[in-house]
Amino acid sequence: MPLLELRGVAARYGALQALRGVDLSVDEGEIVAVLGANGAGKTTTLRAISATVKTSGDLVFAGERLPRRPEAVARTGIAHVPEGRGTFAQLSVDENLRLGAHVRRDRAGVKADYDRTLQRFPILAERRGQAAGTLSGGEQQQLALARALMQRPRLLLLDEPSLGLAPRVVADFFAVIAELNEQEGLSVLVVEQNASLALASSARAYVLEVGRVAVAGASAELQRHESVRRSYLGY
């Protein structure tokens, strides 16, 4: 049974139909990528999972229907790092991290995860009293990820994590994601504009076009798929 399964999911913004019956799944311990042009429905797919947009169809997580309130979704074990990072600019690094654990009640576990997070991201430890808005783009992306990890999620949703970042910063970020997946079994659903990076970092991938799944399969196979190569890989 998949950890996450979407069946016939549709969503709209007013008169605009953003998703048109999307079927998608993520297995336990799997990294899955979602590719597509601007307006294809990638971000809306993540918003549908997080219940920040109204949907129809079936959304199932760990064998149960997902609730349709964002905080309730977070309590199920899904953490969402949105496009643009979504950190609270006026709050300190420390305050952002502690807000990430707001759905938890296990104080000892939160303290252990806080310490572990600062060990994983030493620059955040150095700057934990600093306002998030004063951090560099790469540091803000680290903070957004660290805050999500404070939820202790089973599934991590990442929306365009490489956007606006230098190649070295992007490589380091995806190295952390790979480590979390390999060492802790964290499942990841990532929307990514860099198709080459997304396919190299994932086990399976979906290509969305105008709100529908146009192509799906193993990432290694999609790297050889003619239309994917032509439209998204540039060769």
Description of each model-found segment:
Residues 2-235:
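Glycine-rich phosphate-binding loops of nucleotide-dependent enzymes
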